[in-house]
Amino acid sequence: MLNYQCLETDSYCGTSHIELDGIHIYIDPGSDDSLKHPEVPEQPDLILLSHSDLAHIGGLVYAYYKYDWKNAYIYATLPTINMGRMTMLDAIKSNYISDMSKADVDAVFDSIIPLRYQQPTLLLGKCSGLTITAYNAGHTLGGTLWSLIKESESVLYAVDWNHSKDKHLNGAALYSNGHILEALNRPNTLITDANNSLVSIPSRKKRDEAFIESVMSSLLKGGTVLLPVDAASRVLELCCILDNHWSASQPPLPFPILFLSPTSTKTIDYAKSMIEWMGDNIVRDFGINENLLEFRNINTITDFSQISHIGPGPKVILATALTLECGFSQRILLDLMSENSNDLILFTQRSRCPQNSLANQFIRYWERASKKKRDIPHPVGLYAEQAVKIKTKEPLEGEELRSYQELEFSKRNKDAEDTALEFRNRTILDEDLSSSSSSEDDDLDLNTEVPHVALGSSAFLMGKSFDLNLRDPAVQALHTKYKMFPYIEKRRRIDEYGEIIKHQDFSMINEPANTLELENDSDDNALSNSNGKRKWSEINDGLQQKKEEEDEDEVPSKIITDEKTIRVSCQVQFIDIEGLHDGRSLKTIIPQVNPRRLVLIHASTEEKEDMKKTCASLSAFTKDVYIPNYGEIINVSIDVNAFSLKLADDLIKNLIWTKVGNCEVSHMLAKVEISKPSEEEDKKEEVEKKDGDKERNEEKKEEKETLPVLNALTLRSDLARAPRAAPLLVGNIRLAYLRKALLDQGISAELKGEGVLLCGGAVAVRKLSGGKISVEGSLSNRFFEIRKLVYDALAVV
């Protein structure tokens, strides 16, 4: 049974709920800037994360604590985990989220299990029998297409993917070199987005040229360029484009590039540490190009006050958030985008901006005002007054501060009590384990007779004495009291690999990464010794300063929201560098994937209807195309009667296997029977019941009761009643490979298009819908020779 339920909102944020044979799978619990997630109908058993932006992970932390998702397995790629952590921390600070802390985010993301690309993972427990595999999506660093396989059901979840290469990413694994990846071809159910199905995007070269042209035009006129960006995903592509252009320009450009985000420095550091996840061009140049991903022309700023040190003049500012309704991008809009008409707000992403957001309103204004004579219209002037909501943070005072302190005091007391109780229970458990192990050793000594020796002699101490076990229980229960301080030495835990250690005891003290270099050369020399190395005291001072900055952020404060009317006077433009497919590629690739069921999500109603209409016009494509509404449950199970059977040993020995691709198949005549345990198995079960685990024995018993056995036919009556079938040809012939085989045999072959291969000028091999192949031609030796080559390319079962 395979059910799908769409829980996404109008802004394309939300969760996909898949129920596969009783396993509840939630994919991409996204949210908007509020970081809230709606209540879900069922508790998840498995959570999968595709990308690291808010639309795919924004609601994870909220739902993890609010709806108690702590028992679910969470899987993602390593870049999605690291960049997703940065995205959440940026959103918390930009939106002044008070009910969510950095510790909450770290606890959730530390519980995520990392996966590598094309690493099949067989799950256990409640998800037993389910295999998940991650494939490159090409949209974000670590972005994922998820393949789910359980018995006869196969699901491909492909949302937000990009088939073309970026500056720092490869294209999606779904479509490479003009072919669909064999492992992702013909799934039972394909869940994908119809985003941009109505749009034809210009070539990447044209878009990059228009992007640089617009940026440089504004800078040369004395304007400032504002690029609203996300915190940790597509911003890396913009950094690559800008840094490459600044590095290649001669003479060097005098315009600074600023990356404004509370997590900008850590985002760049994470990107440098995950080069193996990037595109082939990045991996190829690693170790050769010293400036690879150094972004020497980009200054990271984590505090808005540092902008005052830059000074006036043209500059490029990449600032979070995308919507212009919070974060540094809103503050830049308020402070800088109302004075100079040469200033430019350049949008590069649209699908992540909600319909009612300020960014989306500006993009729609640009579309109405621009002339559509060019592929990429020029910027247009925006002169308007706009009402915006501004959040400010003010420290608590008076009665509010006292109430806050009382609440925090009660929380700390409760946390201390819980910690003490947990420590006490753990200590009791350790003592019980220690006493039980010692009592087992004592029990072994009871049956051994010891010769009479003097009490206290070395012979008595070295031997085994019955008197040693006669201990008073009251005395044994007393604990040792320490007069100086209550230090309790913890038990050393040892497993098969050795002693278990704490990694934090051996961690190195790393020097904090530098952000914007505001000091001049003389200050830098003063901070260095003669060898040019930092002193240990300076590193400690830096760590202490960092700690003080974190403490400043923890000052009790309240959030005040005011509505203010601002004046905007600047240029506006949208250039698509979002890294997503367009309508042409979508309508070309999806028919080649050729799924048995297609579910369209993550797009507007017009885009989904257009994609459905395109699929309906294809004669060889499935007619089972679904567009689910919010909360609607649709059944996308395939019409296959699949059963789990156990093959008898005698049957396996006589099977003849034929290799088909990476698999082997065999034809058999067998009979399904209910297994009856033999006398030896009964005796073995009795021994296991006495010595083994009760739960394990019950599982084995249920498995034997539920799995019938497939036995070979031995009776003549069974053989006479068995159905007879013609030989079955199994496999997939590619006409290009067949053409090569024909040419090797000296037979001319020419591809005529539309799945037709003309052989020897007289025989045509045609691929039909449904995987059928026809060989047409006059009966001759050449016809049978070609047919034999076709048979040889298939497995006869």
UniProtKB/Swiss-Prot annotation:
Residue ranges of the region described as Disordered: 519-557, 677-703
GO molecular function: RNA binding
Basic and acidic residues: compositionally biased ranges: 684-703
Lineage: Eukaryota, Fungi, Dikarya, Ascomycota, Taphrinomycotina
Transmembrane segments: none
Keyword DNA repair: no
Name listed for the protein in its UniProt record: Cleavage factor two protein 2
Domain of life: Eukaryota
